[in-house]
Design a protein with these regions (language model features):
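N-terminal Rossmann-fold NAD(P) dinucleotide-binding loop
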Residues: 29-30
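Glycine-rich FAD pyrophosphate-binding loop
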Residues: 37-56
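Active-site-proximal substrate-binding core of FAD-dependent oxidoreductases
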Residues: 260, 297-333
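A conserved beta-strand/loop capping segment in the N-terminal third of enzymes
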Residues: 62-115
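Predominantly flavin-linked oxidoreductase catalytic cores and closely associated redox partners
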Residues: 119-245, 259, 275
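FAD/FMN-dependent oxidoreductases across multiple families
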Residues: 134, 152, 224-298, 304
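Beta1/beta-strand and adjacent pyrophosphate-binding region of the FAD-binding site
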Residues: 15-26
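C-terminal auxiliary extensions adjacent to catalytic cores
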Residues: 321-353
Length: 353
């Protein structure tokens, strides 16, 4: 059996050097990679999936999200369902219905993520199929990234954009960090309205119904530890009301909400890998896009991500205490009182998004 000597191993690694290695080809990683590639920075995205791939997500693009995406990628086109009607429910009863000034854009993540990736590839972006194993900081400051069943990669910056189950984050923290569980299913299209229901029975979460492209997505989530808990809650509140299809499968995903800075200038966590989902609404696409942009800025400027992403870290701290208040019994009481003013409900909803 032939073994490479040390010099050959070093040559192999150097042959696979990139200024930036991005783990994960979801929106956060692809936006970051697109901006780097567009500005002439050598980068590569690593992902284990074959695109297009399924993705569990409501798929809501808020005005902030699609506005920022338009600014960063003006040529990007994608299919979406426009929604302006918002129905707010409390304990199974409709308490307010409003028409939003700005549309919500509902996308199918399987298609949307693939279209984003194709946009990155169309400008010369590189994609490697493989699974992240671990990273090692080298004496010269570079980072050696091991890929399962693949050649190692050497880089100046490692960007962890590998989602809620991030292996990059897990290496840094030593454990998985899950806070909320969300489950959903596809049903036939109904009214073109966004339904949001709160209940004191729910664990810091809500029931939802989102119109999407060719179908609707319904489900619920919150601080639940297992699918069994959510299934029991849905059975009690919604299956009997014929909102969910009894024979359709429920798909689920955990979302980490503990925002994390890696503490290393050359290792950056973005999107769900960094715990950046909205702590109140649990929406993640805006924060995927904005943290992808902020990672690009940090790399281009040679500064810490904690600086370019300062405003987002500050927002996360604010969201934490607002969320605790909103989902408390006192918060639900305030919601009930405020429901008598549709203008107030509308303003609060648009403020969150």
């Amino acid at each position: 059996m032939y073994f490479c000597d040390r010099n050959e191993k070093e040559n192999l690694v150097m042959a696979n050097f990139h200024h930036v290695v991005i783990i994960g080809a979801g929106p956060a990683g692809t936006v970051c990679g697109y901006l780097l590639q567009k500005h002439g920075v050598d980068c590569v995205i690593v992902d284990h999936a074959t695109f297009p791939r399924e993705k569990i997500c409501g798929g809501g693009l808020t005005p902030k999200a699609y506005g920022l995406l338009q600014e960063l990628m003006p040529d990007f086109r994608y299919e979406y369902q426009s929604v302006r009607r918002f129905k707010f429910m409390l304990e199974g009863k409709t308490i307010s219905e409003v028409d939003l000034d700005n549309e919500l854009r509902m996308v199918v993540r399987k298609d949307f993520d693939n279209e984003l990736l194709q946009q990155y590839l169309s400008i010369g972006g590189k994609l490697v199929k493989g699974s992240f194993s671990r990273f090692e900081e080298q004496p010269d400051g570079k980072i050696l990234v091991s890929i399962k069943s693949g050649e190692p990669l050497l880089c100046d910056y490692l960007v962890g954009a590998d989602g809620a189950n991030s292996q990059v984050r897990r290496q840094i923290t030593g454990s998985r960090s899950y806070n909320t569980l969300w489950m959903e299913q596809y049903v036939e299209k109904g009214a073109n309205e966004f339904i949001f229901e709160l209940s004191k029975q729910y664990k810091k979460g809500y029931f939802f119904s989102f119109p999407s492209v060719g179908k609707d997505i319904v489900g619920m989530g919150g601080y639940y530890s297992s699918p069994k808990e959510i299934r029991a809650q849905l059975s009690k509140n919604h299956i009997r009301g014929n909102i969910l299809a009894v024979d359709a499968p429920l798909r689920g995903s955990y979302i980490p909400l503990e925002t994390l800075d890696s503490g290393k200038k050359q290792v950056i966590l973005i999107g769900d890998a960094g715990g950046f989902a909205n702590k109140l609404s649990y929406e993640g696409l805006y924060y995927a896009i904005v943290t992808g942009r902020n990672a690009w800025k940090a790399i281009m400027e040679g500064t810490d991500f904690s600086i370019t992403n300062r405003e987002i870290f500050r927002n996360k701290r604010k969201e934490a205490w607002v969320t605790d208040l909103f989902y408390s019994r006192f918060g639900l009481w305030l919601v009930r009182i405020g429901a008598h003013s549709p203008k107030l409900i509308k303003k609060a909803f648009e403020k969150c998004y």
